[in-house]
Amino acid sequence: MHVAPTTELKALLRLAGPLIASQLAHMLMVLTDTLMMARISPQALAGGGLGAASYSFVSIFCLGVIAAVGTLVAIRKGANDIEGATRLAQNGLWLAWALALFAALVLWNLEPVLLLFGQKPENVASAAEFLTLLPLALPGYLTFMALRGFTSALGRSTPVMVISLFGTVLNYLFNVALIEGMFGLPKLGLMGIGLVTAVVSMGMATALALYIRWHPAYTAYPLRKGLSRPSLAALRELWRLGLPIGGTYMVEVGLFAFAALCMGVLGSTELAAHQIALQIVSTAFMVPTGLSYAVTMRVGLYYGAGNLLAARSAGRVGIGFGAMIMFAFATLFLLLPEALVGLFIDRNDPAFAAIFQVAVQLLMVAAWFELFDGMQTIAMGSIRGLKDAKTTFLIGLVCYWLVGAPSAWLFTFTLGGGAVGIWWGLALGLACAAVALTFGFEWRMKRLLGKAGVRTEAAVSA
């Protein structure tokens, strides 16, 4: 059965709006932690930044694996398999806890690895201090993300937004209290920032769990019943889909880490400009990220129900609408780059004049960069809704590391393109991914429709 594009767009926006807001809230939490590090000392900012980068790199893989929960629950819900959806959500929690333990052990033993990679001992010491309590945030964070996937798959993403916004406010207040030693609390420095993140993450997970436990909308999905008995079959299904998603997240994060290293080779001015421009681009990127999650749920819902025409329509609507939104951001970057960079640094300050100019140049490239990045992440979400993450991983690996990274190196160091050359290389890799993933979604749909040709034709003629 076909679904009108306007009808699908309304349903998509109802689901995506709160998810976008929750993404922005999470970004604000990260920004708050960075600002708090700067309030302690320059050394705390450098070492804490190293620890935060290490935490992000490890946790992003876990986050990708847990993303499978929402996809598979949506497919089961579409198939009206309530018991199967419940079982997958329960085992998603077990998987989240196992990943949290594994990631925490890695982070607690990361100090020798950082030293091996040539990091300054004083920065490694500060990073180790930050990572003393920060890994305790992982059980709460991954539990929250698993439950977020579950409730979003049921079409209820508003509680995720509300809890995320409250968590952002509490994160700021608790950080200030521990850094300033207010209300008789000790000044815990970097360790305190990690502690606050852990407490807030656990609080957010608890709040969402209690909401799901008490709200009547979830009565048909008793997560507590049978939670103590994990299913190996369900865990394997989650792992098979989640592993390539986690791998895709890591190769994309790795591409941007490569870009930062290239900027560092060029100099401090280029690296600082890169960080400012990337902060602006990352904020805008929260919109297609939220849309991508929502598109995955919508496509998965129809795919599980066997309504392949509606699944194709949901993917196309998401990709098309995402392209329109990112075109608007691209126009903004082209028309107002100075104003956007001026939100971060003063163009009239001689100390920042060179950084300002480079950041403006990067933002002009980001107009194309952002358009392609938005399209590729939504197309990726569409394919995952069809229970296929291997295709997205392979396309991402090829486009990011066989096109994007070599192009960035070629444009910068061989052709002398400087910082702008790195971003043109990234844009080329993302453009390759956007085209390949969009065609990949259409190819997957064509194959599925071909296999179900008799039923589909019957449904259309009816």
From Swiss-Prot:
One record GO biological process: monoatomic ion transport
Keywords of this entry: Antiport, Cell inner membrane, Cell membrane, Ion transport, Membrane, Transmembrane, Transmembrane helix, Transport
Disulfide pattern: none
A Pfam family assignment: MatE
Example of a GO MF term: xenobiotic transmembrane transporter activity
Membrane topology: Multi-pass membrane protein
Major site of localization recorded for this protein: membrane
Highest taxon, organism lineage: Bacteria
Localization terms from the record: Cell inner membrane
Any Gene Ontology CC annotation: plasma membrane
Transmembrane regions listed in the UniProt entry: 12-31, 51-73, 93-115, 125-147, 160-179, 189-211, 238-260, 275-297, 318-340, 350-372, 393-415, 419-441
Protein family (similarity comment): Belongs to the multi antimicrobial extrusion (MATE) (TC 2.A.66.1) family.
Its biological purpose: Multidrug efflux pump.
Name recorded for this polypeptide: Probable multidrug resistance protein NorM
Protein's organism: Pseudomonas putida (strain ATCC 47054 / DSM 6125 / CFBP 8728 / NCIMB 11950 / KT2440)
Gene it is expressed from: norM
